[in-house]
Amino acid sequence: MAKNVVVVGTQWGDEGKGKIVDWLTDHARGVVRFQGGHNAGHTLVIGANEYKLNLVPSGIVREGVACYIGNGVVLDAHHLLSEIRTLEAGGIRVRDRLRISPGCPLILGYHAALDRAREAAKSAGDKIGTTGKGIGPTYEDKVARRALRVYDLFDRERFAAKLRANLDYHNFVLTQHLGAEAVEFGSVFEQAMADAEEIRPMVADVSAELYAVNKSGGSLLFEGAQGTLLDIDHGTYPFVTSSNCVAGQAAAGSGVGPGRLHYVLGITKAYCTRVGGGPFPTELDIETADTPGQQMSSKGREFGTVTGRKRRCGWLDLGALKRSIIINGVTGLCITKLDVLDGLSELKLCTGYMLDGRRIDLLPMGSEEVTRCEPIFETMAGWSGTTFGAQSWEALPQEARAYLHRIEEICEIAIDVISTGPERDETILRRHPFGA
């Protein structure tokens, strides 16, 4: 019987979703991206090979698995083709296994120009920390009903007319408001037309194909990008991304009915990280040697896959995690990077906050309120043994098991999967999301 699983990040992204999606793909006929764009960075370690993906779903490294880019994704076609060529150079078949929705809004040259110019114009405290890849401006065009979509690529005259209208508008903003250079029509148009011919064979009715997979008994895996706390509606606004990153978006962003989403796996690091600006209640110093924050940063290799920026690190925030569990309807948790905490003498869990003199247990909405939150910590014993590469619950140090049990108790949810390293087999399974 077909069973569909949604994988979402419960923090500020970078939770290790790519490895888990790859690991789960053994039980899926297809993997689906449903939001975001090439601002996502998923790193997979398969034997001696490391793959860094932005747009192509993580299931692509599994032979025979179909991959889908749903209508909720904003698509930089030129970047996608570059990513495909890199994978093909490594011996991975892509083009006959990848399907792209014709409804994807297109990221074009002026979107990235707007993104960079706006960020440059902001004062230091107001900077979002955008990747500068044009994601936000493209979603703006979609909501304003002026976006060019994949299906527009295949009508040259229509595409040219819409592009001219968009450039008239956006070049005015770039030159008159932001003091940046205008984007030239010819270069954008010719690049888009060249890319169109190359992606045309991969464009398909993704919604209908996903329905057909389920109807024939095949299961699907929906791969979220970024994380719940970066969601445009539910995140620490305005320090968020421009898409919905939550489980509910899997339906809208791919064209499947919500009743066909059967299990939601919430991916959670054993600590917290954040890239870019915005409030972070449990943040630690990552620069001072021999401190917990510095260990998380260095041992966890906490650098952005897309930007290369050093990630901010802090203790696990259960108030934020509980908020994410509620929003996503999480069925079970997957804890990643537990091994990064090996060797710390004590650990802290944020169990709530003091906000304006009163205790609250859930992360509030809006960055202003989150900034005023003072974390309430519970201290637990660390462990001297190693969790790295553990493949069974019994192989974990007693203190590590106690740490995980406490997360389950406070969040009132089961930890179904534990990742203890980057390789596929460095995983502890307690309950399989696909019911296998």
Swiss-Prot record:
Cofactor binding note: Binds 1 Mg(2+) ion per subunit.
MF GO annotations: adenylosuccinate synthase activity; GTP binding; magnesium ion binding
Pfam family name, one: Adenylsucc_synt
Cofactor section: Mg(2+)
Domain of life according to the entry: Bacteria
NCBIfam families reported in the protein's UniProt record: PRK01117.1 (NF002223), purA (TIGR00184)
Identification of the protein by name: Adenylosuccinate synthetase
Organism: Aromatoleum aromaticum (strain DSM 19018 / LMG 30748 / EbN1)
Protein's gene: purA
